[in-house]
Amino acid sequence: IELTVHDCEFGEAPRHIGLLHHLLYVGRIGRFEIRGSRLQGGFRGHLIKSRARLNHIHANFAVDDETGEASYELDLPNGGVAWVVGNVFGQAARTQNPALVAYGAEYDPHADSLLVMAHNTLVNRAASDQAEFVKVWRDRLPAAAEVILSNNLVFGPGRFDGSAWAGSI
């Protein structure tokens, strides 16, 4: 099964305490593509959550606005192959989670796991000393899993994958 989303807008998640309303949730399918779309106004859930084996996430604007309280802006909980290129991800000051992008957070990963993030802009407006632009759960992914981060622009405090602070710009 494949899902393709082009030039769509998702926003203003319901504000029900105790429930997780993801703006876009993709189950465990073969392929997911989202391109040229806008996601904002999350509440406790993630802006994009995909369990697909293959993900193409290109040229999207996934920025939680001032009233937003989203958790992750992008969650790929089961790993898989993900090409994340040319997006803008932005975390609101009232975020529910210190990471913008999460990879492999849950168990039962895909056998082939590769995250390539290039030419993205990541903005952290949360004033947390725990902020992470990209968080990878290596202990939950296959041993051969790869993560390639290249030419990403960051604004605000944060680090990548538990490493030393990337700094504040």
Model-based region annotation:
Residues 1-169:
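Glycine- and acidic/polar-rich repeat regions and solenoidal domains
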